[in-house]
Amino acid sequence: MAEVEIKQENVVHSRPRLITDEEMHYCPGCSHGTVHNLIAEVIDEMGLEEDTIAISPVGCAVFAYRYIDVDWIEAAHGRACAVASAVKRLHPKKLVFSYQGDGDLTAIGAGETIHAAARGENIVTIFINNAIYGMTGGQMSPTTLLGMKTATTPYGRDAALNGFPYKIADMMAHLDGATYITRQSVHTPANVRKCKRAIRKAFENSLAGNGYSLVEVVATCNSGWKLSPVEANKWMEENMLPHYPLGDIKCSKLPK
């Protein structure tokens, strides 16, 4: 059958140009793929393909460099913001962002992340928060909810034993060097559009030299949560979003 040529004015949606042909390794229903698409679309629309340097983490997104066709550096576990800070200082006109999960960012990388924000580094962090260690078997992370069952909290997270989950975005909003802090999701079409706008705003904030930006994406991990993709979205709405409410947390200018 001959291919039907679709006129550009009739295209409703197409594969983002900067998404490679590599088959993504993510589980069906995972939020990572959607966020990858949004990042690729925003970079393309801003004309930054040749002026972007991204830092990939250790975790489920360790192979992000295979999927988005820009320059990447693979950082040691938790050190993405430290690497991004150095790269941005060496290449101040480039868009530099790190892409990290809740294990890489809020556990082993908490110090590097918080201090990058405190210094007001002109970088962006895309933070995927699914409240579990997806790559290593579904263990508890710092953002795991109270009562949430994981491989290391089979009876549910207990504050007396495991401590409380913490909201790193809210914490970082108190830092003068962090000027744009937002929390989004991609579990509905409307939320996907809002998340895309937030990513673009963060990139623009960085390029304007206005300090550190964090886009937290409250995400699902249906395999780690032992739920179907549909059930995971519902569980996230009912349990994650009350604890991690969506919206802009801080939008300001660097202090003089």
What are these regions (language model features)?
Residues 110-115, 135-149:
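Active-site-proximal loop->helix
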Residues 1-12, 16, 21, 207-256:
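Flexible, low-complexity linker and terminal segments
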Residues 70-73, 116, 141-145, 231-234:
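Short, hinge-like loop/turn segments at secondary-structure boundaries
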Residues 1-134, 197-201, 208:
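Thiamine diphosphate
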Residues 51-54, 94-97, 122-126, 170, ...:
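Structural motif
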Residues 14, 93, 141-208:
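Conserved thiamine diphosphate
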